[in-house]
């Protein structure tokens, strides 16, 4: 009777979330751990050989009925009925019910099973049957404790109240929220589909340095580290671009890399300082080829990962089937903001026009024409681009690595892809003129000296590489995390990164 009251107290404590109650429950579980060892039972077992998974049994009942099986998993629920107990155990494929009966396992084992807690991991040997309620179940003949859980699983894990804790303790989130696990399984499918697509197109996957002497390839503030043996500062890469283009100089014609980038910037629903990018380069191609490749790749990935190009994101239906609209940047601004930057060719004129338009956009008097154009676009146009849209022909001031347009040198052969008001991809016809490239780098250096910490640094070795001759090429970067957000209907980038960066608790 005393033992029963103790277990009732344990269940009562488990239902509450107070810290003192949690500590008491953990104390009770540690007592159970000690009891197991006193009985000569090792609560943290070694290798355990299963014959089947939960999903296989559930999907193949006709084949599996009355057959012997050995399964393993975590106890997720339990209900006792005197001389018999039903429980659900969860493995990597799903949950299945087990039936433990006193007459089948014996008094000692049945008493031991009654002392197990939700969260404990066990192995079960038995046979498959279906209950009167129609649930596929494994009737246990024996079981083995594989791992004793000392912390109770939270009962109320859903909802915004627990969202930060879910990110901090993703391991618990994955246990109790199957839909979260599905997101990361889909993420894996998406990345695999990207590789399959590019491999099929003849691209070669490569790896380039994560620590760089000079960070380049993007406008971003880098993380700095120090190499003790060489006594020199290094930068975590903000992009692999300049190294991948060095490979084009070396004779590789189609290369890609899927890897991490690091940018010392703010955190939001769209930004994490550590993120995954797909970047690729193709010799003898241009940004039109990259647009064709982008819409073909993303639609193919959607079909391989989800089975369709029609998805729903945050209540909005989005059709990823190509072709996608291709609209010049200045034209989109003219349509949505009423500003004709094509007729405003100086920064002063552009600045004055934006102020008179009453957009409510804060500009810096030092902003260049291209910077003003981009700020207006991001503020007014970007949120309205819901269906997949290529915005093309960006100002040269904000595109230091893109080739100038022959018919208008103030613009470049560059595009960005927007879906649901978010940038998903960035691409251009690559600048392969070493003299023009050096001149643009020098302008970026001037910006850095003026206080712009995100401006590009001079990379003399990259200029040296271009001087050997780089073939004309198209380049493309796709944010894998944002693509996964889109294809899994996830509102925040933290929902698609297993362990997002979190500020430590005090």
From Swiss-Prot:
It catalyses: tRNA(Lys) + L-lysine + ATP = L-lysyl-tRNA(Lys) + AMP + diphosphate. The keyword Ligase applies. One of its GO terms (biological process) is lysyl-tRNA aminoacylation. InterPro entries: Aa-tRNA-synt_II, aa-tRNA-synth_II, aa-tRNA-synth_II/BPL/LPL, Lys-tRNA-ligase_II, Lys-tRNA-ligase_II_bac/euk, Lys-tRNA-ligase_II_N, Lys-tRNA-synth_II_C, NA-bd_OB-fold. Signal peptide: none annotated. Binds 3 Mg(2+) ions per subunit. GO terms for molecular function: ATP binding; catalytic activity, acting on a protein; lysine-tRNA ligase activity; magnesium ion binding; transferase activity; tRNA binding. The keyword Protein biosynthesis applies. Pfam families: tRNA-synt_2 (PF00152), tRNA_anti-codon (PF01336). Its cofactor is Mg(2+). Its EC number is 6.1.1.6. Mg(2+) 2 binds at residue 423. Keywords: Aminoacyl-tRNA synthetase, ATP-binding, Cytoplasm, Ligase, Magnesium, Metal-binding, Nucleotide-binding, Protein biosynthesis. Homodimer. Belongs to the class-II aminoacyl-tRNA synthetase family. This is Lysine--tRNA ligase. The gene is lysS.
